[in-house]
């Protein structure tokens, strides 16, 4: 998970759902970990470049006997390191929801994004943090009677200022059926 320190170059981005991006002329990205269908682990911190990398996102677990409605923001995004730090981006955390029925509006956002790597010089920038993991498990039969939820989901991986190195991959979204 944790990105490697840069040793003078950019710190590696933290891994979670996927491997973190490598730092420019520096640290390797962190390894992937966790379970897409039952995500409970928080995100990891990015590797140190000149200053420390960003922090990983936390973990949210919601368990309900019947209905969960999302009309606001649930966020476990990773964070960037300090400005001009060469630090790797922190990875997104985990959001795990189990319920009978799931609903929400267009104001609803569930987010586990990885943070961008920080910049100092083009070749020495930090790697991006991996996106996190989001799983919403519901009863498929009960859910079929509901309107399709308008909730938005984001689990993008962080980027790097150097497009030749440091990009991370997106996180995972898991639902019990593809509809």
Model regions and ranges:
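Glycine-centric low-complexity/flexibility signal
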Residues: 1-135, 157-171
């Amino acid at each position: 998970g944790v990105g490697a320190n840069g040793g003078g170059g950019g710190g590696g981005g933290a891994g979670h759902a996927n491997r973190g991006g490598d730092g420019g002329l520096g640290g390797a990205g962190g390894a992937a970990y966790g379970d897409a269908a039952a995500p409970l682990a928080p995100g990891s911190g990015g590797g140190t470049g000149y200053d420390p990398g960003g922090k990983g996102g936390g973990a949210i677990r919601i368990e309900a006997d019947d209905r969960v409605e999302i009309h606001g923001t649930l966020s476990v995004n990773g964070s960037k390191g300090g400005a001009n730090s060469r630090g790797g981006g922190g990875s997104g955390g985990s959001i795990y929801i189990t319920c009978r029925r799931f609903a929400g509006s267009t104001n609803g956002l569930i987010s586990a994004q990885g943070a961008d790597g920080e910049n100092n010089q083009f070749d020495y920038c930090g790697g991006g943090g991996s996106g996190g993991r989001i799983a919403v498990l519901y009863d498929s039969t009960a859910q079929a009677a509901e309107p399709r939820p308008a909730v938005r989901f984001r689990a993008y991986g962080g980027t790097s200022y150097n497009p030749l190195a440091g990009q991370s991959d997106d996180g995972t979204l898991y639902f019990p059926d593809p509809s």
